[in-house]
UniProtKB/Swiss-Prot annotation:
The gene is BZIP28. The keyword Magnesium does not apply. Homodimer. Hetereodimers with BZIP17, BZIP49 or BZIP60. Binds the CCAAT box-binding heterotrimeric factor composed of NFYA4, NFYB3 and NFYC2. Interacts with SAR1B and STL2P. Interacts (via C-terminus) with MED37A/BIP1 and MED37B/BIP3. MED37A/BIP1 and MED37B/BIP3 dissociates from BZIP28 under ER stress. This is bZIP transcription factor 28. It is found in: Endoplasmic reticulum membrane; Golgi apparatus membrane; Nucleus. It is a single-pass membrane protein. Keywords: Activator, DNA-binding, Endoplasmic reticulum, Glycoprotein, Golgi apparatus, Membrane, Nucleus, Stress response, Transcription, Transcription regulation, Transmembrane, Transmembrane helix.
Amino acid sequence: MTESTSVVAPPPEIPNLNPSMFSESDLFSIPPLDPLFLSDSDPISMDAPISDLDFLLDDENGDFADFDFSFDNSDDFFDFDLSEPAVVIPEEIGNNRSNLDSSENRSGDGGLEGRSESVHSQVSSQGSKTFVSDTVDASSSPESSNHQKSSVSKRKKENGDSSGELRSCKYQKSDDKSVATNNEGDDDDDKRKLIRQIRNRESAQLSRLRKKQQTEELERKVKSMNATIAELNGKIAYVMAENVALRQQMAVASGAPPMNPYMAAPPLPYQWMPYPPYPVRGYGSQTPLVPIPKLNPKPVSSCRPKKAESKKNEGKSKLKKVASISFIGILFFVFLFGTLVPFMNVNFGGERGSFGGLSKYDGHRYYDEHKGRVLMVGDGSDVRRNSGISEGNIHSSRISHGERDSCGGVDYNAHPKVEGRPSSLSNASDPLFASLYVPRNDGLVKIDGNLIIHSVLASEKARGLGKKNITETVKTKEPDLTIPGALSSALAVPGVRGNAAMLPHSTALSSEGKRLHQWFHEGGSGPLMDYSMCTEVFQFDIAPGAIVPSSVSSISAEHLQNVTTHGKRMKNRRILEGLPVSLVASELNITGTQPNKDAQNKTFNGNTNKPTSSSSMVVSVLLDPREVVDSETDRVVPPNPKSLSRIFVVVLLDSVKYVTYSCVLPRSGLHLVAT
């Protein structure tokens, strides 16, 4: 066989046998028949709106995050076995097999693409045979044209008479058979897709049911809340109505004109029902919202007795309180005056007796314990008077000569009355026998107060009588003390014996007219102080008819203001306050020769030169406040015995005149020790 070298003419145009077939360009512009599931560009895309799966698109709260649509098996859609023959060729056209193979090789890529498109179109149509046949025809049209060209060239060489129309019909039938075999392999994929679609629909249905249940539950809760609100509103209305009724009752009880009472409803138990609140009037209406139970009106007069009773009860309670307070106050005063006052040392007119059933105080206790200063004054008679100050209290006693116990005590029953003077309770005009203890040179110095008083009396009498036998006169700005020669026997040199007993010298010393050199005595020798060291500071008379002071402490407080120049320190200028006295046993002994007792008694009793009509009393002995008062702290400080240089003595003369003397203490010499 020889091949013809003629030029192959193009085959005639074959009419379109399938009117529903579209071109490849038109296939992408027209949407698929079932747009609910698949689209043109992505057949298995889920972006298209799906009516049965709206919950996937409207899931704003993430309620359907549990549903998982996996596409792990999506590769099976494109897993085709290309080794199988695409077309079964009949035997009568077996000689054209080689040409078909070559044409298939040339259009291999296009055939695969058309085959995949036909498979996708078949899946999306859910078993629609019409759509599959249309897509198959549309996809196989380019292949048929290629086959026609090859067959025309073959026919011209072999048969030459065959027509291209018969060949195209045969090739079209073979393509239909190959598509049918491919559809059988894709049935499993369709089943899986259907199962997945059913599962998705079931999950969507379950989600809808769950939403419906939640909505019903919320509606039920809203209804219950509305019922509760209605119930509370009803209760509030009832309470408000009851409050209005109570206010009306209070207005009636207080006496205000009663308001028009509301009509009482029958007493029925109020049942709270879950209904909306009752409609009421506008704001400010006094109409009761609910029925008010009937209240029994109480008469106005019934409240008045209660008020009266309440007032009576209040008055009784107040009376009880006042009575209890007054009773407590009375008990306090009874305790104060009945218990505390008797312990205080009361001195009336120089006497201290029993008070409140307490025992009398023994004067000798002050001498034994040395808790205060002791003043002893004697005028030569048998009666002596002791005065002691301890812890701010003043004590005095009278001692008769020869009537003294072993301890120096006092017999209070032996108090003779003085003619023309008050009784023993007011015997402030009696002479006071005093001896003064003054701290000096780190010890206690005993000053004989008797000598001071006698020198004062001698000076006064010498001035009054104007006698010419004055032995010495010292003149300064202020009147000085003078001692007449006739009364020199009154200045007896003290001899300390026993409990501050005064022992003068013999009359032989006084008859010589010499000055006595000693007011202090230690060891029986040594000049310490004379009477010329005392100077009168001032004096004043008591008003005629005045009562003699019964307390020595009050007089000393009065004259304390005149002595000092600082009036604001009155409470700190008692010299005998706060000054401790400590006498040890070694200081209670004295050395030296003492005159015999007979000479002493003779001197005391035989002194006829001293007038007996005059009386004197040492009221107080003061220290210089400039030496014992601290100017910064305004407090009394214990003085330094070495720096103490001056004392002040206040003497009461004949109960009509107070005289204050300033006595200068010696700066050198032996310090005195007294028993």
